[in-house]
Amino acid sequence: MAAKEVRFSSDAREKMLRGVDTLANAVKVTLGPKGRNVVIEKSFGAPRITKDGVTVAKEIELDDKFENMGAQMVREVASKTNDLAGDGTTTATVLAQAIVKEGAKAVAAGMNPMDLKRGIDLAVEAVVKDLTKNAKKITSNSEIAQVATISANGDTEIGRFLAEAMQKVGNEGVITVEEAKSLETELEVVEGMQFDRGYVSPYFVTDAEKMRVEFEDPYVLIHEKKLSGLQAMVPLLESVVQSGKPLLVIAEDVEGEALATLVVNKLRGGLKVAAVKAPGFGDRRKAMLEDIAILTGGTAISEDLGIKLENVTLNMLGRAKKVVIDKENTTIVDGAGRKKDIEARVTQIKAQIEETTSDYDREKLQERLAKLAGGVAVIRVGGATEVEVKERKDRVDDAMHATRAAVEEGILPGGGVALLRALKALDAVKPDNPDQKAGVDIVRRAIQVPARQIIQNAGEDGSLVVGKLLEKNTYNWGFNAATGEYQDLVGVGVIDPAKVVRTALQDAASVASLLITTEALVAEKPKKDVAPALPPGGGMDF
């Protein structure tokens, strides 16, 4: 086991505080509409230019092991806030720095760290209640566009695209962000459920020009196993022919005699049919077939359920308004599933998303949720250079998460004003002792810092402007850093999602209060590189 280095009490906290400051100072220059960019060196390719707090935080590693511990703890704050709310990472970092700084001073003055932590927790709880009480629900499309525009650092085009995408696919729908091949940013919406499997054979094509299959009002057979012989399906196929409707077969694979028979029937015109392979693999395939069954109001034919193919009747097949299949994708539009069943399935998938610890699983579950709940929108971000496209893509990602958060928990005035207005809520907090009161006062000072930083980044005097704001009692009245005017912030669209402000404060307080209560740091001693011995020298007589 390698030797360790240990630091104690004020020495330990001082080192950690230095690391916290290094990271937070690099991140906080990006805060607000007039925040600056940070340029990050990449190990290959051009440097990356960003105004996204979490991207900056993730790039910072310090030489000194003890300082690095402090920096990594604050980096954790930014990452956690980003995962939960998708934005507010810079605010969270600034809050964490303020709480750690004030807390370290209080501990150095001889206060009990555990009571300070209790005081901080009491204060945070009071502020969160105040934020929740004052949050305004958003409903209109223009409000959604405003939130998106602010999170995208004032880019109205991004705001417009996001509002349009959310209107089309709903709040649960998946919005993916890709890099475009052109200068323009564009939006493409896929309605209904789409999965990445195309037709098994090109002979199924109904539109030869576009090389795709289009069915109106088809039946959908969902089968979990391979189909190689059609003997068991003959009665079902006869019923489908009599109904005069097309049939889409989704199975693990369709091969041999089964495929030949379906193709021949299609070419002779007796049966409008198309077959596609089932999406996904293993357990995920089962779950996705079940999703398709619920969406179309059919039954997934599976031996687990004891249903054999020969016993399948027409009423066990799913129905949809339209199905479009091309070489690579199948889209089912407007399935005939019962709304109640689809909602129950959506709730079940949401519960799984909450429980899962794997990012990959979460992403796949969210895809399934979107396909059931509304559809998929793709925003393709354009730009003149690769660096510009990457930077805009970062901002679209931020804006998308912030907009979702705003729809979820409502909006508050932006510019750090909501936290300033929450100062009043702290007057009602009843701490048990002077040390807890000091903890409440730490939060009282910390929640003024984001507003000050935004104002400072805009080139104004932070303390002066914050003093002016606190003199006036109107909740939405604040300083618009973009224009340099005092106005009703919600009225002019300077807003923050309540979830983002709440998450930033809770995460910052959680990590910062742990740093305050730290009394010892343990790190590995750096290994001394010993130069290898030189090989023995030979004589010169050869």
UniProtKB/Swiss-Prot annotation:
Binding residue positions for ATP: 30-33, 51, 87-91, 415, 480-482, 496
Gene3D superfamilies, sorted: GroEL, GroEL-like equatorial domain, TCP-1-like chaperonin intermediate domain
The EC number(s) this enzyme carries: 5.6.1.7
Protein origin, superkingdom: Bacteria
The reaction(s) this protein catalyses: ATP + H2O + a folded polypeptide = ADP + phosphate + an unfolded polypeptide
Cellular component per GO, a single term: cytoplasm
Pfam families: Cpn60_TCP1
Function: Together with its co-chaperonin GroES, plays an essential role in assisting protein folding. The GroEL-GroES system forms a nano-cage that allows encapsulation of the non-native substrate proteins and provides a physical environment optimized to promote and accelerate protein folding.
Stated family: Belongs to the chaperonin (HSP60) family.
This protein's name: Chaperonin GroEL 1
The organism of origin for this protein: Nitrobacter winogradskyi (strain ATCC 25391 / DSM 10237 / CIP 104748 / NCIMB 11846 / Nb-255)
Primary gene name: groEL1
